[in-house]
Structures are given as C-alpha cells and as structure tokens.
C-alpha cells in the first residue's frame, strides 16, 4: 500500500466509526 493511502484510511476509518457508533 502507498503511505498516502494508509494516512487517508487512518483518518477516514475513525471518522466513519465515530459517525456510525455516535460516540464522538
């Protein structure tokens, strides 16, 4: 994987999880 992809995923995944779980 590209470092850029990992950085984006590291930022997007927690945000999506936060939005779904409603535990921001």
From Swiss-Prot:
GO cellular component terms attached to this protein's record: extracellular region
InterPro entries recorded: Antimicrobial_frog_1
Localization (cell): Secreted
Primary localization: secreted
Positions of disulphide bridges: 18-24
Tissue expression pattern: Expressed by the skin glands.
UniProtKB keywords: Amphibian defense peptide, Antibiotic, Antimicrobial, Cytolysis, Disulfide bond, Fungicide, Hemolysis, Secreted
Biological process, per Gene Ontology: defense response to bacterium; defense response to fungus; killing of cells of another organism
Chain's role: Has antibacterial activity against E.coli and S.aureus strains. Has antifungal activity against C.albicans. Has hemolytic activity against rabbit erythrocytes.
Family: Belongs to the frog skin active peptide (FSAP) family. Brevinin subfamily.
Name of the featured protein: Brevinin-1JDb
Organism the protein comes from: Odorrana jingdongensis
Classification lineage: Eukaryota, Metazoa, Chordata, Craniata, Vertebrata
């Amino acid at each position: 994987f590209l470092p850029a992809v990992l950085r984006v995923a590291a930022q997007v995944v927690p945000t999506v999880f936060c939005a779904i779980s409603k535990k921001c």
